[in-house]
C-alpha cells in the first residue's frame, strides 16, 4: 500500500507538462447538469498534485467513480510505476493482456491531448485579455506590455507548447464543463475551439475574472461571453445606439462651435460613454432599480448632464454666459463641477427613475466615497437592504483610478456590513493619458483597473470604438451587479481627441499619439457607416437624426439668451423636499430649547446602565461602568458618555435616525462609550441597548469603520446629504488624524454650501487636548478649522432679536469646544432642532471623560435649558466684578487646569474665568457683555496650545472689534512651535506650569505694549 501512496507523485512525472504552468479544469468526470466542476490550481503551489491524489484515491476505492479516461490513465500509469518492482501489484489493479498495450498507449495520448485542450481553454480565459485589440488607436497594448503569453495560440508553432500538432487542428475534442464556447455542442475541432476562444477573449473585449474565487461567478461570466451568438442586437437596439451616439457627439460639437475658447473638458474620443451609461441605467431600471446616484470627474460631465440626467440644455448653456448674475447665496462653482437631481420616465422601460449626479471638486476621485454614502443612506431610508431599488455608478479617469488612494479606501468599504451599497458599477474612461503623463509613468500595474482585484470585482476591458461591444459589456455589468450584489468595472479604452482641456496643446508631449488621433475616424462615422452598409439605417435617416438634435441645441441656445439670472439652486444634487420653504429658505429663524423632560433623562439613563437581553454575560469591567451610570442617573448627574447617550436617545425618541461611525467608535477609543455590548460566552453575539429605548424609536447605527479617514469621512458626508432628519457623526480616533481626510473637509464640508448651495449637518467629533501624549495624539488643529470659518473678524454685528440663529445660518460651519457634558448634550440636540443644517465641528475631550469635576446635573439638561455659547464666571469673582483684576477667557479642558491653579493661589475673587464654548461663529454679543461686566479687569486669552496654533489668532481680532480696540486681549499659553505637542512628559508639565504661572501673575503684563 505504501507503493500505492507514492503513485500520485510518479503519475505527476507523466502529467508534468500539462500541470506545470496552469490551472487545469477537470476533464469530463461531471455532467454539465451537476453544477460547476472542480478545478485545481497551478502545480507551483502544490494544488495540481493534491487534485490528482484525490482523483487517484477515489479511483482506488472504486474505479467506476471517475471518468473512464481517468480509469485508463491510472491503470496504465500504475503498471509503469510498478514495472521492474519485485513487489506484487496491488489487487485493485487489473492485469491486462499484452494485446492491450497499444490500446493503453492510445488512451494515454487521448487523455493527455484532452488535458492539453483544457489547459489551452483556461489559458485564454486567464490571459486572453493581454492580446485583446483594445486600443482604438492601435498604438498600445492596454496592459502596457507587448509580451504575448506563450500559452496562447497566436501562431501555429505555439501548438507545440501543448504537445499538439497542426494535424490535430481538425480533431474533435470533448469540451470541459468550464467553457460555453460549444453552445449546445459538447465537442468541437481544435481549430474551431481556438477560433471561438480568439473571438471571445482576444478581440475588442478583454476579460479579467479568473482571479475570482467563486466558481459560480466565474461560470456566470463565461456563459455571458463565451456562448456563441450572445452579442446579437436587434435593428431597433442598433438604431437607439446610433441615436445616442449622435447626441453625444453633436452636443460636444455644438459647444465647440459656440464657445470654442471655453474650458468644458469634452468627451471627444470617448463619446460612447453616453450610451454606455444609459445602457447601465436602462438595464438596471429593467431589473427594478428606481434611484441611480452617479459620481464622476470633469471629463464629459456636461454631456452626461445633458444626455443622461437630461438637464435642460438652456440651463447648461447659461453657464457659458459670463454676464449672467448669480441669484443664490454663495460663490458657486465652475460648470463642470455642478451636480443635478432629476426624476423622469425611463423611455426604454417606461418606469420612473431618479437620477442624481453628485457635485464634486477638481480633486479627482474625492467624490467616490461621498456617492457611496449617499447611496447607502437612500437604501437605508427605503428599507432597501439588498440594493434592489437604489444603486451607484462611479465614472473614473484611468490615471486617477490608478493613482488616488481614496479609490482603494472606497473599494474596501464595498463589503463592510455598515457601508456596503450592494455593488457599484465602475466605468473607467481610459484615454491612456493623464493630462500630459504617459501611463507608463503613471502606474506600476499593467492596467489602471488592477485596484479592483482586491475585492474580486470582474474587470471588463472594451475598445471604445466598438459601440456594440461596449453596450453588451455594460449590459452584462448591470446584470452582474443585480445578480451578485458586487462591484464590477468597465474599462472603456479610448483616446482624448483634444488636450487636457480645450485650450491645451497635447502635441508638446504626445506627438505620435496625437498624429494618430488626428487621423482617427470618429466613432459615430464608423458606426453609422456600418449600419448603413448592413441596411439597418439609411444615410438620409442618419442625417435627419443629426439635424434633429442640432435643431434641439439651437433652440435651447436661443432660449438661454433670454435668461437674466443664474440660479445655482437649479443644480442641487440632494434636495430635501419640505424642509425649507418654496424659496429654499428656512421656515423660521428660531431654535427651540434643547432640554428634555427629566423622566426621559431618567429612562435613558436606566437603559444605558442595563443589558436589555436575557442570558447575556458582559465583561466584569463593563459591569462596573454600567453600575457607575446607574449611580449617576440616581444622583441626577451625567458624565460625558452618559450625556451623549441621552442626546442620542432623546433624538431617537423624536424619530431622528442617529448614525455614529469611525474607528473603534462602538467601544470608544478611550473605552468610555460601550454602545455595543459583547457576550463574553457566545462569539459574535452583541447587543446595542440604544435600540431598546422606545417601541417606536428611530434606528440607531453605531459602526466601527475601516482604518480609513478620507474614505470613511467622505462616506458619512454623503450619508448626511440624503436627509436633514438624521444626526450623522464621524469620530476620529484622535483629532490629529482628521488631516488624512483633509480633502473632504476642505472641498466638501467647509465649502459645500458656498459652491453648491448644499446644506449638510454632519458632525465631526475630534478628540483634542494637550496631555503629554506626543505630537500625533494631542491636537485636532483647531486653528485650521477657524481659519476656514467665514465670519468677518472686522465687522461689528447688529445684535438683532434672532442674532444667535441668524449668525449660525450665515456661517459655513459651527466650531465648538464644550467644557461640560450638559453643553455637549445640548449642542448635539441643537444640530437637529435648528431650521437649517450646518456642519458641526466638536473638539471633544480625552481626560475630561473621567474627570471628577467634568460632570453635569440634570438641572442643566431638563426642559427649558439650552446650549450655552459662553459659560460665564459664577463664583466669587462674579459676585464682586468691580474687584476683579483679570478676566481670563478660555475654551475646553484648560478651564479645569485654570480653576485648580486659581484655587491653589487663592485668587477666586481677583481672577474671573469665562469659557468660550462656541468659538465660531464668534459670540460677539456675549463676549461684549462679559467684558463690560468687569470694567477694571485686564483681559487675557488662555489656551494650552502653542501660540501659532489653537484659537488666539482667530479670537484676537474679534475681541478688538467688539471692544472697539479700547482694551487689549493678552495671550497666555505655550510659545510658538513647529510640532503641536511635546512627546516628553516632563517637558509637557514644565510648559503647563509656566503658562499657568503667567495666567495668575497679576503683574505679568505691566509695562508691555499690545
Curated annotation (Swiss-Prot):
- Tell me which GO cellular component terms the UniProt record holds: mitochondrial matrix; mitochondrion; oxoglutarate dehydrogenase complex
Q: What is its EC number?
A: 1.2.4.2
The residues that hold thiamine diphosphate are 299, 398, 431, 433, 663
Q: What is the effect of changing residue 244 to W?
A: In YOBELN; uncertain significance
Which key words are in the record? Answer: Calcium, Disease variant, Glycolysis, Intellectual disability, Magnesium, Metal-binding, Mitochondrion, Oxidoreductase, Thiamine pyrophosphate, Transit peptide
Pfam families, alphabetized: 2-oxogl_dehyd_N, E1_dh, OxoGdeHyase_C, Transket_pyr
Transit peptide extent on chain: 1-73
Which SMART domains does UniProt cross-reference here?
Transket_pyr
- The residues that the entry says bind Ca(2+) are 130, 143, 145
CDD domains named among the record's database cross-references: TPP_E1_OGDC_like
Question: In the record, what terms sit under GO molecular function?
Answer: metal ion binding; oxoglutarate dehydrogenase (succinyl-transferring) activity; thiamine pyrophosphate binding
Predominant cellular place of this UniProt entry's protein? mitochondrion
Q: Which cofactors does the annotated protein need, by name?
A: thiamine diphosphate; Mg(2+)
The induction annotation reads: Post-transcriptionally repressed by microRNA miR-214 in cancer cells.
Q: Where in the cell is it found?
A: Mitochondrion matrix
Q: What does this protein do?
A: 2-oxoglutarate dehydrogenase (E1-like) component of the 2-oxoglutarate dehydrogenase multienzyme complex (OGDHC) which mediates the decarboxylation of alpha-ketoglutarate in the tricarboxylic acid cycle. The OGDHC complex catalyzes the overall conversion of 2-oxoglutarate to succinyl-CoA and CO(2) while reducing NAD(+) to NADH. The OGDHC complex is mainly active in the mitochondrion. Involved in the inhibition of cell proliferation and in apoptosis.
Q: Kindly identify the disorder that the protein's record connects it with.
A: Yoon-Bellen neurodevelopmental syndrome: An autosomal recessive disorder characterized by global developmental delay, and variably impaired intellectual development. Additional variable features may include hypotonia, spasticity, ataxia, hearing loss, visual problems, seizures, and non-specific anomalies on brain imaging.
Q: How does it assemble?
A: The OGDHC complex comprises multiple copies of three catalytic enzyme components, the 2-oxoglutarate dehydrogenase (OGDH/E1), the dihydrolipoamide dehydrogenase (DLST/E2) and the dihydrolipoamide dehydrogenase (DLD/E3). OGDHL/E1-like isoenzyme may replace OGDH in the OGDHC complex in the brain. The presence of either ODGH/E1 or ODGHL/E1-like isoenzyme in the complex may depend on its tissular distribution.
Give the protein's recorded name.
Answer: 2-oxoglutarate dehydrogenase-like, mitochondrial
Native organism is Homo sapiens
Source species taxonomy: Eukaryota, Metazoa, Chordata, Craniata, Vertebrata
Amino acid at each position: 500500500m505504501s507503493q500505492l501512496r507514492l503513485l500520485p507523485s510518479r503519475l505527476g512525472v507523466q502529467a508534468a507538462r500539462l500541470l506545470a504552468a496552469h490551472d487545469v479544469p477537470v476533464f469530463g468526470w461531471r455532467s454539465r447538469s451537476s453544477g460547476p466542476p472542480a478545478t485545481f490550481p497551478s502545480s507551483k503551489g502544490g494544488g495540481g498534485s493534491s487534485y490528482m491524489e484525490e482523483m487517484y484515491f477515489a479511483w482506488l476505492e472504486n474505479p467506476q467513480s471517475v471518468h473512464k479516461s481517468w480509469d485508463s490513465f491510472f491503470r496504465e500509469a500504475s503498471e509503469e510505476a510498478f514495472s521492474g518492482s519485485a513487489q506484487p501489484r496491488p489487487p485493485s489493479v487489473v492485469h491486462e493482456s499484452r494485446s492491450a498495450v497499444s490500446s493503453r498507449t492510445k488512451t494515454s495520448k487521448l487523455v493527455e491531448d484532452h488535458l492539453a485542450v483544457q489547459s489551452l481553454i483556461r489559458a485564454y480565459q486567464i490571459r486572453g485579455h493581454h492580446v485583446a485589440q483594445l486600443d482604438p488607436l492601435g498604438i498600445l497594448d492596454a496592459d502596457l506590455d507587448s509580451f504575448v503569453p506563450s500559452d496562447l495560440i497566436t501562431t501555429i508553432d505555439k501548438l507545440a507548447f501543448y504537445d499538439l500538432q497542426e494535424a490535430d487542428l481538425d480533431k474533435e475534442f470533448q469540451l470541459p464543463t468550464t467553457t460555453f464556447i460549444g453552445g449546445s455542442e459538447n465537442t468541437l475541432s481544435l481549430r474551431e475551439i481556438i477560433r471561438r476562444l480568439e473571438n471571445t477573449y482576444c478581440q475588442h473585449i478583454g476579460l479579467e475574472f479568473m482571479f475570482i474565487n467563486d466558481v459560480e461567478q466565474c461560470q456566470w461570466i463565461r456563459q455571458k461571453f463565451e456562448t456563441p451568438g450572445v452579442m446579437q442586437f436587434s435593428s431597433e437596439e442598433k438604431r437607439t445606439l446610433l441615436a445616442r451616439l449622435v447626441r453625444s457627439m453633436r452636443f460636444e460639437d455644438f459647444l465647440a462651435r459656440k464657445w470654442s475658447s471655453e474650458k468644458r473638458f469634452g468627451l471627444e474620443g470617448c463619446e460612447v460613454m453616453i450610451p454606455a451609461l444609459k445602457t447601465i441605467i436602462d438595464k438596471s431600471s429593467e431589473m427594478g432599480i428606481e434611484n441611480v446616484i452617479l459620481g464622476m470627474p470633469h471629463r464629459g460631465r456636461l454631456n452626461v448632464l445633458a444626455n443622461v440626467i437630461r438637464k435642460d440644455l438652456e440651463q447648461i448653456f447659461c453657464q457659458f454666459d459670463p454676464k449672467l448674475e448669480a441669484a443664490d447665496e454663495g460663490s458657486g462653482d465652475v460648470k463642470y463641477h455642478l451636480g443635478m437631481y432629476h426624476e423622469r420616465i425611463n423611455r426604454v422601460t417606461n418606469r420612473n427613475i431618479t437620477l442624481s449626479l453628485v457635485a464634486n471638486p477638481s480633486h479627482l476621485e474625492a467624490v467616490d466615497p461621498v456617492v457611496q454614502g449617499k447611496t447607502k443612506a437612500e437604501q437605508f431610508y427605503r428599507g432597501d437592504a439588498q440594493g434592489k431599488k437604489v444603486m451607484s455608478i462611479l465614472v473614473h479617469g484611468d490615471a486617477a483610478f490608478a493613482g488616488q488612494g481614496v479609490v482603494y479606501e472606497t473599494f474596501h468599504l464595498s463589503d463592510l456590513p455598515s457601508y456596503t451599497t450592494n455593488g457599484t458599477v465602475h466605468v473607467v474612461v481610459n484615454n491612456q493619458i493623464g493630462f500630459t503623463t504617459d501611463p507608463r509613468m503613471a502606474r506600476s500595474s499593467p492596467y489602471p483597473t488592477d485596484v479592483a482585484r482586491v475585492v474580486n470585482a470582474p474587470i471588463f476591458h472594451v475598445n471604445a470604438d466598438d459601440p456594440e461591444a461596449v453596450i453588451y459589456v455594460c449590459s452584462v455589468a448591470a446584470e452582474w451587479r443585480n445578480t451578485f450584489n458586487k462591484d464590477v468595472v468597465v474599462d472603456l479604452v479610448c483616446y482624448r481627441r483634444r488636450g487636457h482641456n480645450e485650450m491645451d496643446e497635447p502635441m508638446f508631449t504626445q506627438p505620435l499619439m496625437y498624429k494618430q488621433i488626428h487621423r482617427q475616424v470618429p466613432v459615430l462615422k464608423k458606426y453609422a457607416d456600418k449600419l448603413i452598409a448592413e441596411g439597418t439605417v439609411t444615410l438620409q435617416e442618419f442625417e435627419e437624426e443629426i439635424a434633429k438634435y442640432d435643431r434641439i441645441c439651437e433652440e435651447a441656445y436661443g432660449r438661454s439668451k433670454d435668461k437674466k439670472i443664474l440660479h445655482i439652486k437649479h443644480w442641487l444634487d440632494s434636495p430635501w423636499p419640505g424642509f425649507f420653504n418654496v424659496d429654499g429658505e428656512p421656515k423660521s429663524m428660531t431654535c427651540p430649547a434643547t432640554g428634555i423632560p427629566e423622566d426621559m433623562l431618567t429612562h435613558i439613563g436606566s437603559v444605558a446602565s442595563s443589558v436589555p437581553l436575557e442570558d447575556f454575560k458582559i465583561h466584569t469591567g463593563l459591569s462596573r461602568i454600567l453600575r457607575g451610570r446607574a449611580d449617576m442617573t440616581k444622583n441626577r448627574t451625567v458624565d460625558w458618555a452618559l450625556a451623549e447617550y441621552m442626546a442620542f436617545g432623546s433624538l431617537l425618541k423624536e424619530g431622528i435616525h442617529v448614525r455614529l461611525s469611525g474607528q473603534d467608535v462602538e467601544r470608544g477609543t478611550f473605552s468610555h462609550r460601550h454602545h455595543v455590548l459583547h457576550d463574553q460566552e457566545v462569539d459574535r453575539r452583541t447587543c446595542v441597548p440604544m435600540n431598546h429605548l422606545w417601541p417606536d424609536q428611530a434606528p440607531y447605527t453605531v459602526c466601527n469603520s475601516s482604518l480609513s479617514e478620507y474614505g470613511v469621512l467622505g462616506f458619512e458626508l454623503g450619508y448626511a446629504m440624503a436627509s436633514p432628519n438624521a444626526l450623522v457623526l464621524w469620530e476620529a480616533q484622535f483629532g490629529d488624524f482628521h488631516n488624512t481626510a483633509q480633502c473632504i473637509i476642505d472641498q466638501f464640508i467647509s465649502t459645500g454650501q458656498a459652491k453648491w448651495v448644499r446644506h449638510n449637518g454632519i458632525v465631526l467629533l475630534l478628540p483634542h487636548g494637550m496631555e503629554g501624549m506626543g505630537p500625533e495624539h494631542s491636537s485636532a488643529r483647531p486653528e485650521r478649522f477657524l481659519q476656514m470659518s467665514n465670519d468677518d473678524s472686522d465687522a461689528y454685528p447688529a445684535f438683532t432679536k434672532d442674532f444667535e440663529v441668524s449668525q449660525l445660518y450665515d456661517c459655513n460651519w459651527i466650531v465648538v469646544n464644550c467644557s461640560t457634558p450638559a453643553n455637549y448634550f445640548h449642542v448635539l440636540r441643537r444640530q437637529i432642532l435648528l431650521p437649517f443644517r450646518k456642519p458641526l465641528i466638536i473638539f471633544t475631550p480625552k481626560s475630561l471623560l473621567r474627570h471628577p469635576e467634568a460632570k453635569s446635573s440634570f438641572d442643566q439638561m431638563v426642559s427649558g435649558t439650552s446650549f450655552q455659547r459662553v459659560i460665564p464666571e459664577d463664583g466669587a469673582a462674579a459676585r464682586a466684578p468691580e474687584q476683579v483684576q483679570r478676566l481670563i477667557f478660555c475654551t475646553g479642558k484648560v478651564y479645569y487646569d485654570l480653576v485648580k491653579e486659581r484655587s491653589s493661589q487663592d485668587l477666586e475673587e481677583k481672577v474671573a474665568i469665562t469659557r468660550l464654548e462656541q468659538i465660531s461663529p464668534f459670540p460677539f454679543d456675549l463676549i461684549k457683555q462679559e467684558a463690560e461686566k468687569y470694567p477694571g479687569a485686564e483681559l487675557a486669552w488662555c489656551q494650552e496650545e502653542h501660540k501659532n496654533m489653537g484659537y488666539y489668532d482667530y479670537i484676537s481680532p474679534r475681541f478688538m472689534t467688539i471692544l472697539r480696540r479700547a482694551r487689549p486681549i493678552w495671550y497666555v499659553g505655550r510659545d510658538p512651535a513647529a510640532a503641536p505637542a511635546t512627546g516628553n512628559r516632563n517637558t509637557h508639565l514644565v510648559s503647563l506650569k509656566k503658562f499657568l504661572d503667567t495666567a495668575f501673575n497679576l503683574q505679568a503684563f505691566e509695562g508691555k505694549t499690545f
